[in-house]
Design a protein with these regions (language model features):
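Active-site nucleophile-adjacent alpha helix/oxyanion-hole segment immediately C-terminal to the catalytic cysteine
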Residues: 1-54
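Conserved active-site-adjacent core of cysteine acyl-enzyme catalytic domains
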Residues: 3-9, 45-159
Length: 159
């Protein structure tokens, strides 16, 4: 899949499925590391340990930030950076990052808290934004029968 006039997507973004019920955060982190480095730097459970992930609470944002800072990356997160105030600003943020080849690791309320990576945005070629979708690399892809690691979600619902 390649970007076009209404689709912005990171090409060749490899997905992986998490190995435990609580390591979606480390799996998402490893997908991003692999995108940039061509391979993971640490095994998923080692990443979970560095992040302070637990079997009951998974991984919090601070743990995610700590891991990327530990490996020497510049991190932007909701802990210290301004987040988009409106849906329109959110879409601009997503599209801008993707056009700069930057995947966006996000946590949301699915499964009581779940980490995924935004790797694509599609305006569907329409003038209104209510039908726009996000393409996610999902380490727990059970929402369809493909289990290919990709999911498509309504952008407005996600925001």
């Amino acid at each position: 899949m390649q970007s076009d006039e209404h689709l912005t997507i990171l090409p060749k973004f490899a997905t992986t499925q998490q190995i435990t019920h609580y390591t979606c955060g480390p799996a998402a982190a490893n997908m991003v590391v692999t995108y940039y480095k061509g391979k993971t730097l640490d095994e998923e459970l080692a990443v979970a340990k560095i992040m302070g992930s637990s079997k009951t609470a998974g991984t919090n944002t601070k743990g995610m930030v700590n891991y990327f800072e530990k490996i020497g990356w510049e991190v932007h997160s909701s802990i210290k950076d301004k987040t988009p105030d409106s849906y329109k600003d959110f879409l601009k943020f997503v599209e801008s990052n993707l056009k700069n080849n930057t995947p966006i690791i996000v946590e949301n309320v699915d499964w009581g808290g779940h980490w995924r990576v935004i790797i694509g945005y599609d305006s569907m070629g329409t003038a209104h934004q209510s039908d726009d979708v996000l393409i996610m690399a999902d380490p727990y892809d059970t929402t369809d029968h493909l289990q290919d690691g990709y999911s498509i979600v309504p952008a407005e619902r996600f925001f």
